[in-house]
Amino acid sequence: MRLRRLAGRRPRRRYVAFEVLSLDGPPPGKGEFEEALRGVYLKAFGAESLALARPRIVYYEEESGRGVVAVVRDYRYHILAALGLVRMAGGRRVLVVPLRTSGTVKGALRAFRSPGAPGRGGV
């Protein structure tokens, strides 16, 4: 006999591709940026929302400042707002630009390709 989960379905996740533009030198490291994002999210939406959203950085290029953050689907607009509110990370002034929201990491990573790159439809 197969056991059923009583709690319901596993929450779906969305992946938001973003780019960090640093005004003071190189972009911050992954840990510095994740700490700044969590702090802004906590201040804007509270501890309960932060716990339910479970934001985490699944991909981050420290040289370019590009990355992907995973979040529970119901909180995707919260993470977009929090990304826009991040102004300091690792002691540097930064501006975070959300590029694309996707249902898969692979789809989010496509946002980093150049517009004429293969697989993007030449758009």
Swiss-Prot record:
This enzyme's EC code(s): 3.1.26.5
GO cellular component terms attached to this protein's record: cytoplasm; ribonuclease P complex
- Species name: Aeropyrum pernix (strain ATCC 700893 / DSM 11879 / JCM 9820 / NBRC 100138 / K1)
Q: Which Pfam families match?
A: RNase_P_Rpp14 (PF01900)
Alphabetized SUPFAM superfamilies for the sequence: Rnp2-like
Does Endoplasmic reticulum show up as a keyword for this record? Answer: no
Keywords carried by this UniProt record? Hydrolase, tRNA processing
Q: Which reaction does it catalyse?
A: Endonucleolytic cleavage of RNA, removing 5'-extranucleotides from tRNA precursor
Q: Whom does it interact with, and what assembly results?
A: Consists of a catalytic RNA component and at least 4 protein subunits.
> Which InterPro entries does the protein's record reference?
Pop5/Rpp14/Rnp2-like, Rnp2-like_sf, Rnp2_archaea
What are the GO BP annotations of this UniProt entry? tRNA 5'-leader removal
Q: What class of enzyme is it?
A: hydrolase
- Give a yes or no for keyword Magnesium in this entry: no
Q: Which domain of life is it from?
A: Archaea
Organism lineage string: Archaea, Thermoproteota, Thermoprotei, Desulfurococcales, Desulfurococcaceae
> What is the official name of this protein in its record?
Ribonuclease P protein component 2
- Entry's family note: Belongs to the eukaryotic/archaeal RNase P protein component 2 family.
The GO molecular function terms of this record are:
ribonuclease P activity
Describe the function of this protein: Part of ribonuclease P, a protein complex that generates mature tRNA molecules by cleaving their 5'-ends.
